[in-house]
Design a protein with these regions (language model features):
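Hydrophobic/aromatic beta-strand patches that form the interior of the parallel beta-sheet core
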Residues: 52-54, 85-87, 121, 146-148, ...
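A short, small-residue-rich loop immediately preceding and capping a beta-strand
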Residues: 112-150
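Short glycine-/acidic-enriched loop or helix-start segments at secondary-structure transitions
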Residues: 63-65, 131-133, 157
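ATP/NTP phosphate-donor binding region
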Residues: 2-118
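Short, flexible, glycine/charge-rich loop motifs used to bind or transfer phosphoryl groups or to couple energy/partner
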Residues: 41-42, 110-111, 135-136, 173-175
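Short leucine-rich amphipathic alpha-helices used at interfaces
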Residues: 6-7, 130, 174
């Protein structure tokens, strides 16, 4: 017969406290507005930091000079950040349904050498912020995300949320991560 051993379980518990700042500004990419550069420099690590910007392409119709402004901002603040690329993506739920787009973003993050000390800036509505957040959270053990919501709904939902999700297998928000933003800029 097998002798039954009785023992008390070892129970482990941990808590993770995390905070991030939400800043309100205008003309985020104006060269004289140092907010974005200040937020990146505040991590206390030596710079410049690699930064990829992923932007809802619907914004470009209303702000045709935005990509040029982002490039100029990167040049003006090159002591703090190195702009590796700006990637326009289609907005809305279509971006969260496209596994190929997410894989392409992750491949781009790898190709430009982003790591967990780098930043991805997501600019757009809630669906784009969710998709970009998911791609960043699942690449290289998590790449820091700065969210820039451009709709009222995104400001109140994904712009300040803790989850990043994509749609898969015909189900909305099936794949999800819990990963807080490094910062929110609104």
């Amino acid at each position: 017969p097998v002798k039954r051993l009785t023992h008390q379980p070892i129970r482990q518990q941990f808590a993770v406290a995390f905070r991030y700042d939400v800043h309100f500004t205008e003309q985020l990419f104006h060269s004289e507005n140092s907010l974005l550069a200040d937020v990146i420099a505040a991590d206390g690590e030596a710079g410049p930091k690699k930064v990829m910007v992923v932007i809802d392409d619907g914004l470009l119709a209303f702000h045709p000079h935005l990509l040029t402004q982002i490039q100029a901002y990167g040049q003006c603040h090159s002591r703090v950040l190195t702009l590796t690329s700006t990637v326009p993506v289609r907005g809305g739920e279509a971006s969260k349904n496209d596994a190929g787009l997410i894989e392409q973003l992750q491949r781009s993050m790898d190709e430009v050498g982003l790591c967990r000390h780098s930043y991805v800036i997501g600019i757009g509505g809630g669906a784009v912020l969710d998709m970009v957040g998911y791609a960043a959270a699942t690449a290289h053990r998590g790449i820091r995300l700065i969210r820039v919501p451009t709709t009222v709904l995104a400001q109140n939902d994904s712009g300040g949320g803790v989850t990043n999700s994509i749609n898969a297998s015909g189900q909305k928000k099936l794949l999800r991560t819990f990963s807080l933003s490094y910062a929110g800029l609104q």
